[in-house]
A protein has these predicted regions:
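C-terminal substrate-binding/catalytic lobe of Rossmann-fold NAD(P)-dependent dehydrogenases
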Residues: 133-139, 148-309
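Rossmann-like NAD(P)(H) cofactor-binding subdomain of soluble oxidoreductases
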Residues: 87-153
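N-terminal Rossmann-fold NAD(P) dinucleotide-binding loop
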Residues: 12-13
Length: 309
């Protein structure tokens, strides 16, 4: 198996490192536009192989897409962060050009690849990748909800005093601090509803802290997080390559599911060798469905910016 990670920044490099450590692929390519960055990080990772015991061959490349040929899965992390004074339209315009170019170049050399989108704004970049490439919808996956759900489990574990691994909890909707919807009503701790163990105030606090999880980290460390986003991308790669059929929240194309069409939003899906394989309807209540519709409206307004480019 062969995996490519486009973008050798903190998120991309962390994702690649997780993939290598787990021995998910025989070959791993790290690609970046900045001269020497991908090559240097690839060599650094390869020098851990003797210490960590993996055999994945990691290659770095400066913008040479021929090195990515034959990739089974491609993780796209490319794009610029939003800078002070930059409008939403400017951010979308800049990153849309980057993501579209990356996807087109990748598919020239790996026409059968499954694409995992991490670039922001993630919901809109996933929609762009789908519409610009014309790929079957199951081969375009936005990572956002996988990360948001992991952050939700972290917040729950802190209040419950339990292992995050013992929790089942998902976040649906858009990948943004005003568009995500942590479904605390459906969250369980080894099959028991978490709401049995948490006060109403605690539940509200957990939801609020989950929604600003990314912003909280940016404030603390001065830049966007990278460990959890990178790990989330690698977890999706693992479920694809090992055909695990694991359940994740991912940003995928909807065609009537959850009452939405012509949009990519975070919903529960199974992830296997064919990409995303099945959307699960968790049965939102009236309040949750209203929030989901509001989230869709916000994401759709972001997508509308693409039409002006």
């Amino acid at each position: 198996m062969k995996v490519t990670v486009v973008g050798a920044g903190a998120v991309g490099a962390t994702c690649a490192d997780n993939i290598a450590r787990a021995a998910l692929a025989e070959e791993l390519v790290l690609l970046d536009i900045k001269e020497g960055l991908a090559e240097g990080k690839a060599q650094d990772m390869m020098q851990t192989a003797a210490l960590l015991g993996f055999d994945t061959r990691i290659t770095g490349s400066t913008n040479d897409y021929s090195k990515t040929a034959g990739s089974d899965v491609v993780v796209i992390t490319s794009g610029l962060p939003r800078k002070p004074g930059m409008t939403r339209e400017e951010l979308i315009g800049t990153n849309a050009g980057i993501v579209k170019g990356v996807a087109e170049n990748i598919l020239k050399h790996s026409p059968n690849a499954i694409l995992i989108i991490i670039s922001n704004p993630m919901d809109t970049m996933t929609y762009l990748a789908l519409t610009a490439t014309g790929l079957p919808k199951n081969r375009i996956i936005g990572m956002g909800g996988t990360l948001d759900s992991a952050r939700f489990k972290y917040q729950l574990s802190q209040h419950l005093g339990c292992s995050p691994a013992d929790l089942n909890a998902v976040v649906v909707g858009g990948h943004g601090d005003t568009t995500m919807i942590p479904l605390i009503r459906l969250a369980t701790w080894n099959s028991a509803p978490v709401t049995k163990f948490l006060s109403t105030e605690q539940q509200k606090q957990i939801v609020a802290d989950t929604m600003v999880g990314g912003a909280t980290l940016t404030k603390l460390i001065g830049t966007s997080a990278w460990y959890a986003p990178g790990a989330a991308g690698a977890a999706l790669v693992e479920s694809i390559l090992r055909d695990e059929k694991k359940l994740f929240t991912c940003c995928v194309s909807l065609n009537g599911e959850y009452g939405q069409k012509d949009i990519c939003l975070g919903v529960p899906v199974t992830i296997g060798r064919n990409g995303w394989e099945k959307i699960l309807d968790f049965g939102l209540d009236a309040e949750e469905q209203a929030l989901f519709s509001k989230s869709a409206d916000a994401v759709r307004s972001m997508n509308d910016v693409l039409k002006t480019l």
